[in-house]
Amino acid sequence: MRQIAFREALREAMQEEMRRDEKVFLMGEEVAEYDGAYKVSQGMLDEFGEKRVIDTPIAELGFTAIAVGAAQNGLRPIVEFMTWNFAVLALDQILNTASKMLAMSGGQIGCPIVFRGANGSAGQLGAQHSTAFESMYANIPGLKVISVSNPYDAKGLLKAAIRDDDPVVFMESEVMYGEKGEVPEEEYLLPIGKCFIKREGRDVTIVSFNKMMKVALGAAEELAKEGIEAEVIDVATIRPLDWFTILESVKKTNRLVIVEEQWPFASVSSEIAYRIQKEGFDYLDAPIRRITSADAPMHYAPNLVAAYLPNISRTVKLVKEVMYMKK
């Protein structure tokens, strides 16, 4: 099977959906003339023209409001944020209009829109460009929240998101745009609201999403050298959460470790831990454990960045703790 970069998978998803449906269009900062800040939309202006690939001012609240209004009037916008850190300026439109309009209108007015862009840390970018936002948006009823970890899932889920009739928050990662993975040439869609088992195992379940899947899979490889077989699950869709797949894995392994790039309080791991202990308490042979980013803004110095984020060695250590192995 061919291998393409993450950015190419996203581009193909948008191109295919824009060819299929003339109501789909892309707008955001530098998406047209500059081919996108991360070159995700490269060549799309030439193919679709300036009415469907639209450069915007640096005014997130304003252009998000235009897109939300377009969605409420029958179009299907894709809004690219250069980073989700900047999208907080548009939160009024995402929270108070896009997520609520279907309920406020008694089901008469929908908002089929995709908000997408880079999320979380990407090295030494400082505190204001390094926040992971999955849990914040997942706390909003009316939104669907997707956070992808590889090109195959990115393409299949973005196509599904563009076709979805609800507003979808679609989170990527700046550090993954150049990474390559297998993506078939034929069309496919992936289901929103499903976890994906990326590695089967019997001893412990490790759950993660977005670029922390690298940590989860890397930890599983290290553990395998010691005879510990970890089952690794990519959540992929944060809301609606497919806790059932996680529960079925825990029924087999009896242990759960969650890895996420977010602050610990009121996080995605908090929700997963609550749901699994509620529905599967009798299957647990150890407390559910998690590894998150530090409960502080992310600093700039490389040693502090390394200390802030989850890593493979800390994850391996945590797995051994839930297996009651010697430290």
Predicted regions and their residues:
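Thiamine diphosphate
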Residues: 1-167, 171, 306-307, ...
